[in-house]
Regions:
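Juxtamembrane/disordered regions of integral membrane proteins
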Residues: 1-165
Length: 165
């Protein structure tokens, strides 16, 4: 714990740098915009979802309540005719960017604290190990930020091209 307190400034600066760079990537350079698509009949899709009174949450098409139903003939037909999809519905109203950005910064801070903790446990605060500690912090951070979407590509059909961005 003392090592983390000694590293408070690098931890905070690292979280701020990641936050600022990620904000630039998403809001200024719009790196991921090409990954999102709209429906040609968006108004009809929105009306259908509203008609179902769906609460905020995650939904899957086609839906089955268990593996037995998923393996049934009716479900096989639904899969064959499509569409197959995963939908996340948020609460109605404008997006609260302040809250989202605040939570994103807290996540950046959390990743940095975990990486610093691991490095301090392995190498202490000895300046002779700074290069090795930096490599470890970089690897842990890369895994935390970069590998989280692999499961989405495997299970939810997100394009694998997202993994390289």
């Amino acid at each position: 714990m003392n090592a983390l307190l000694a590293l408070w400034l690098p931890i905070l600066l690292s979280a701020v740098v990641v936050f600022v760079i990620s904000s630039l990537v998403h809001m200024v350079f719009k790196w991921h915009n090409s990954e999102y698509h709209g429906f040609t009949n968006e108004d009809a899709v929105r009306a259908a979802i509203r008609a179902g009174n769906a609460a905020p949450g995650q939904y899957v098409l086609p839906y089955s309540k268990d593996m037995k139903e998923m393996g049934g003939e009716a479900m096989g037909k639904k899969y064959a005719e499509g569409p197959i999809g995963f939908v996340t519905l948020a609460a109605n109203g404008p997006m609260n960017m302040g809250r989202s950005l605040g939570l994103w910064f807290l996540y950046c801070l959390f990743v940095t604290v975990v990486a610093a903790f691991l490095a301090s446990q392995l190498f202490g605060l000895d300046h002779g190990h700074a290069r090795a500690a930096g490599k470890l912090v970089g690897a842990v951070s890369f895994i935390a930020y970069g590998f989280g979407k692999i499961a989405d590509s495997i299970w939810m059909g997100h394009p694998c091209s997202r993994l390289t961005r």
